[in-house]
């Protein structure tokens, strides 16, 4: 399965968009309905910054470590969930406001593990 197929397969239910970002900040895939600043996203992850901004929406980081990034918008505009793909890239997804970020993380992490084999 290709990178695009794996990342795109996540888009259903509560996950509305995905992106795969190399640790350099280079975006190697993003769903057509999303515009992500790859360098910013990687800096938030690496530096454990308190917030991430995607498409002008600020999300407060609630959990970040070497394996994951979980952020939520305090105004109820959804969540950002990310999992590391073998230390090579960060797979992030937008989770709808009614979605459960921790449940989405399980799906995203599983896909990130598959991505690590093809990156």
UniProtKB/Swiss-Prot annotation:
A molecular-function term among this protein's GO annotations: actin binding
GO terms for cellular component: cytoplasm; cytoskeleton
Regulation: Inhibition of rabbit actin polymerization is reduced by phosphatidylinositol-(4,5)-P2(1,2-dipalmitoyl), a soluble form of the phospholipid phosphatidylinositol, suggesting an unknown lipid might regulate actin-profilin interaction in vivo.
UniProt keywords, alphabetically: Actin-binding, Cytoplasm, Cytoskeleton
Locations listed in the record: Cytoplasm, Cytoskeleton
Protein's UniProt keywords contain Cytoplasm: yes
Gene3D superfamilies from the UniProt entry: Dynein light chain 2a, cytoplasmic
Domain of life: Archaea
InterPro entries: PFN_sf (IPR036140)
Protein family per UniProt: Belongs to the Asgard profilin family.
UniProt function note: Binds to actin and affects the structure of the cytoskeleton. At high concentrations inhibits spontaneous rabbit actin nucleation. This strongly suggests this archaea has a profilin-regulated actin system, and actin-type genes can be identified in this organism.
Name of the protein in its database record: Odin profilin
Species, as recorded: Odinarchaeota yellowstonii (strain LCB_4)
Classification of source organism: Archaea, Promethearchaeati, Candidatus Odinarchaeota, Candidatus Odinarchaeia, Candidatus Odinarchaeales
């Amino acid at each position: 399965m290709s990178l695009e197929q794996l990342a795109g397969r996540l888009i259903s239910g509560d996950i509305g968009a995905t992106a795969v970002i190399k640790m350099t900040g280079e975006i190697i895939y993003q769903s057509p309905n999303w515009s992500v600043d790859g360098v910013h996203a990687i800096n938030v992850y690496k530096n454990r910054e308190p917030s991430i901004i995607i498409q002008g929406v600020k999300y407060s980081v609630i959990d970040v470590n070497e394996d994951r990034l979980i952020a939520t918008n305090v105004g109820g505009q959804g969540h950002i969930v990310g999992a590391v793909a073998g230390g090579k890239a960060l797979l992030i997804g937008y989770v709808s406001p009614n979605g459960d970020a921790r449940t989405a993380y399980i799906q995203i992490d599983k896909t990130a593990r598959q991505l690590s084999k093809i990156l």
